């Protein structure tokens, strides 16, 4: 099987391999990773043909392009030996074609004279066509992979250009700076497009976002051909009554306007006000004979409860029958604001998975984001369900915390152990403070104090060790006041 070099973007490294595999699955082409390293933008894969390579790379967000691999080696002598042994029979078909040679270095560079010498070293290929820097018939590129602060490359690749991805065009088109309607919680456009790829969004599929906000995820899914709809507990966000988060922007902006901006209105079914625990969507009853799901996929970024405690629709206090009767038709009155109660973020994640199990078709995907503190055992808090297979976990790290994109596949009925689905039981927490229900929210506002206290203790240990060394060498022992001063200064610097 031919080998190809994928030129990756050196960003969101834990997402890159997952996205490539998802795109190959969508295109229906077998893909095998021959060489992949997170600290390098060069990846070697096996693909059946050039046409398969074009399909696999076409809508990638984290790959820049794909090249037919003509040779590789740790030195230029090894590279040329590899090119001769692998591609000699390929040269005649390009003998009269116009061509272009370029050189790219990762963490290193070459002067113009050095680049010219490297290009001349391939003269044994004896191409007779004219060199052309713009729109050549065939383009070749040398890739040099350097270690940091090292002048010689550690590895070199040589390849023939096959195709670019849509990365640059998509990022430019969906840039949030150019979007008419955004909010303070709108997710970066690159990540929404990436989530759509990993969730196997494809033309003709039906996708739903239960926390749509200003419509970032539905827009990304619609861009790749899906039919989309969404919901949110705050109807003002959907209708645009709260205004835009962009300074100086006036006028009426809403989710529909965003779809019109990208000419995607025909793919948008609409939106409604709801939370996932009280959804008006049909929840099919479990059936052993057939699967009754109707969604091809779910993409969402659930609220973490940081800016305000996580809430769902419902009263915090139990209502008497008389009170419930009097409130029954109040939602029809103008200006009605539905009551809300605090809710557990962990319980919400379980609700999302239970909803996915009930509504996804077999092999349907759900991709959702969730936060976690870096100093916790992350695997323990990843939710699970016997009817869902966790296919990938991708991490986006921040300063003191991180969030993960979890992707699940809806298992077919024959894949689910008998009785496993019925054994899933959930406990609902009511009437508690939002911080008690949401461990991540509490840690966020405490500034991850456990981490800070560990850092201060480490600084004190360093100071004590310094004092012991001075005593051993006959120096003056610093007093308690000096130790406190050093610790305070170190804290200030950190």
Q: Can you describe what each PLM-predicted range is?
A:
Residues 22, 81, 85, 117-125, ...:
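Charged/polar, solvent-exposed surface patches and flexible loops
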């Amino acid at each position: 099987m031919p080998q190809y070099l994928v030129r990756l973007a050196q960003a969101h490294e834990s997402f890159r391999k997952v996205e490539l595999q998802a795109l190959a699955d969508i295109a229906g082409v077998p893909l095998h990773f021959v060489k992949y390293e997170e600290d390098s933008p060069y990846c070697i894969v096996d693909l059946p043909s050039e046409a398969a390579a074009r399909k696999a790379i076409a809508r990638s967000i984290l790959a820049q392009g794909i090249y037919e691999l003509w040779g590789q080696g740790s030195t230029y002598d090894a590279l040329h030996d590899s090119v001769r042994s692998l591609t000699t029979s390929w040269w005649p078909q390009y003998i009269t074609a116009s061509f272009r040679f370029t050189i790219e270095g990762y963490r290193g560079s070459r002067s113009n004279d050095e680049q010219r010498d490297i290009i001349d070293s391939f003269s044994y290929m004896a191409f007779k066509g004219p060199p052309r820097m713009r729109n050549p018939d065939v383009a070749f590129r040398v890739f040099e992979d350097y270690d940091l602060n090292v002048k010689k490359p550690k590895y070199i690749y040589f390849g023939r250009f096959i195709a670019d991805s849509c990365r640059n065009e998509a990022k430019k088109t969906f840039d949030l700076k150019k979007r008419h309607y955004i909010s303070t919680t709108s997710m970066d456009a690159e990540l929404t497009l990436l989530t759509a790829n990993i969730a196997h969004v494809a033309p003709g599929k039906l996708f739903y976002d239960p926390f749509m906000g200003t419509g970032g995820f539905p827009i990304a899914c619609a861009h790749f051909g899906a039919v989309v709809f969404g919901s949110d507990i705050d109807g003002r966000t959907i209708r645009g009554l709260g205004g835009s988060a962009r300074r100086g922007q006036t006028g009426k902006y809403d989710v529909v306007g965003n779809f019109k901006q990208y000419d995607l209105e025909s793919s948008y079914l609409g939106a409604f006000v709801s939370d996932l625990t009280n959804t008006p969507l049909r929840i099919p009853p479990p059936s052993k004979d057939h699967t009754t799901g109707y969604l091809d996929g779910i993409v969402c970024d659930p609220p973490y409860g940081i800016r305000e405690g996580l809430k769902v629709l419902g009263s915090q206090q139990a209502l008497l029958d008389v009170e419930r009767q009097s409130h029954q038709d109040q939602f029809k009155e103008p200006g009605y604001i539905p009551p809300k109660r605090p809710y557990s973020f962990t319980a919400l994640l379980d609700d999302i998975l239970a909803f996915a199990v009930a509504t996804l078709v077999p092999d349907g995907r759900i991709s959702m984001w969730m936060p976690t503190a870096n100093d916790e055992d992350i695997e323990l808090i990843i939710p699970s369900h016997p009817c869902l297979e966790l296919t990938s976990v991708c991490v986006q790290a921040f300063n003191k915390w991180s969030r993960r994109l979890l992707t699940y596949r809806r298992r077919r009925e024959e894949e689910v152990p008998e009785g496993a689905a019925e054994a899933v039981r959930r406990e609902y927490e009511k009437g508690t403070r939002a911080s008690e229900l949401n461990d991540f929210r509490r840690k966020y506002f405490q500034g991850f104090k456990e981490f800070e206290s560990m850092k201060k203790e480490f600084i004190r240990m360093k100071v004590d060790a310094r004092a012991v060394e001075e005593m051993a060498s006959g120096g003056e022992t610093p007093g308690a006041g000096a130790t406190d001063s050093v610790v305070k200064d170190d804290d200030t610097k950190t």
